[in-house]
Curated annotation (Swiss-Prot):
PROSITE patterns: MSCL. Homopentamer. It comes from Pectobacterium carotovorum (Erwinia carotovora). One of its GO terms (cellular component) is plasma membrane. Residues 1-16, 95-137 are cytoplasmic. Belongs to the MscL family. This is Large-conductance mechanosensitive channel. Channel that opens in response to stretch forces in the membrane lipid bilayer. Forms a nonselective ion channel with a conductance of about 4 nanosiemens. May participate in the regulation of osmotic pressure changes within the cell. Keywords: Cell inner membrane, Cell membrane, Ion channel, Ion transport, Membrane, Transmembrane, Transmembrane helix, Transport. SUPFAM superfamilies: Gated mechanosensitive channel. HAMAP family: MscL (MF_00115).
Amino acid sequence: MSIIKEFREFAMRGNVVDLAVGVIIGALFGKIVSSLVSDIIMPPLGLLIGGVDFKQFALFLRNAQGGIPAVVMNYGAFIQNIFDFIIVAFAIFIAIKLMNKMRCKQEDTPAAPPKPSAEEKLLAEIRDLLKEQQTRQ
C-alpha cells in the first residue's frame, strides 16, 4: 500500500474530518469571543471604572534608551485574555451541560428488552419439560 493511499484513507476517516471541523469552528468561536470581550464587554467596563482602556495597562520595566526599545509588561492585555478565557470556558460549560441533558433524555427512553438467545430458549424448554414431568409424578 502506498503512503499516499494510506494518508488518503487516514484523512477521510470520520474522526479526522470531525476533528478538523471542530478545530476550525473552535478557532472561529475564539475570534467571536475575543471580539465580544474587547469590543462589547471591556469598553463599558472601562467606562464604569473611569474611562479606562484595559489594553493600555502596562508596567514599564525599563524606558527606551537610544536604540534600545523599552521593556514593558502589558498586563492589560493579560486581563483581557482572562476575560476571554472565562467567557469561552462558560460557553463550553453551557454547551456540554446542554449536550449531557439531551443525552440523558435519550437514555431515559426504555430500550426494548433483548430477544432471548437460542441458549435461553433451549433452557426455557428444558425447564418447562422438567415441570411437566414433576407434575405427572
